[in-house]
A protein has these predicted regions:
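Amphipathic alpha-helical and helix-coil boundary elements used as assembly
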Residues: 1-214
Length: 214
């Protein structure tokens, strides 16, 4: 009889923090430091000694031949929850989701359970980049942090061939939580599907400032 497999005697669960997403095999795996299983002392357990965790994908992604959305969008510093696929052996973690919160302090790369990267080594981050606010996207909670930048980008008194002029309209953004559904990338590309009553919008924006809004 096979020993130590998921579901045999229930599941062995964990919560933890992602410390590495540079999977050498490019399978979307991440290294996770698990609360209660791993110490925060990196001299005892350095990041590179943590096991690679597989990331469970939704059924809208086939996990086959690149179909669907890949790779998983976890970053260093993400809090996650999962289980050990090999149960009590605890060498094959599987992540089933993330846990948002309200970070109260910036990461300390000298300790575990933090983004281990320093600013000079992080392409984006290190995370969190903001503290004392919700992990929800700012635009999803009604904070239009693009408003001032957009005002400077708006064109007005643009001439036309028939001698008339026109002006680019201001954004109708008036999002109310929890009805604005936002997807944002690390570099700043944004996609919004806003279901705020009487203010529904679709908005897609390139980090350079180019956008469309319906």
């Amino acid at each position: 009889m096979i020993q130590n497999f998921q579901g045999q005697d229930g599941f062995v669960w964990f919560t933890g923090v992602v410390e590495d997403r540079q999977d050498p095999d490019k399978l979307g795996r991440v290294r996770v430091r698990c609360v209660g299983y791993h110490t925060d002392n990196k001299t005892k357990i350095p990041t590179e000694d943590l096991p690679w965790a597989w990331v469970m994908m939704p059924t809208t992604t086939s996990s086959m031949n690149g179909l669907g959305q890949t790779p998983p969008f976890l970053v260093e510093g993400s809090w996650v929850i999962g289980f050990w696929r090999d149960a009590e052996s605890m060498q094959e973690p599987v992540i089933i989701g993330t846990l948002p919160g309200k970070p109260s302090q910036f990461g300390n790369p000298d300790f575990g359970f933090h983004d281990p990267r320093t600013e000079d080594k992080a392409v984006y981050g290190p995370y969190p980049i903001r503290i004392n606010e919700s992990d929800m996207n700012r635009r999803s909670v009604g904070a239009d942090y693009l408003a001032e930048a957009r005002k400077e980008e708006i064109y007005s008194n643009i001439g036309t061939a028939d001698g008339e002029t026109w002006a680019e309209p201001e954004s109708p953004y008036e999002a109310i939580y929890p009805y604005n559904h936002v997807y944002e990338t690390e570099s700043g590309h944004i996609r919004e599907f806003d279901d705020t009553k009487f203010r529904t919008r679709i908005h897609e924006r390139h980090r350079s400032g180019s956008y469309y809004e319906i």
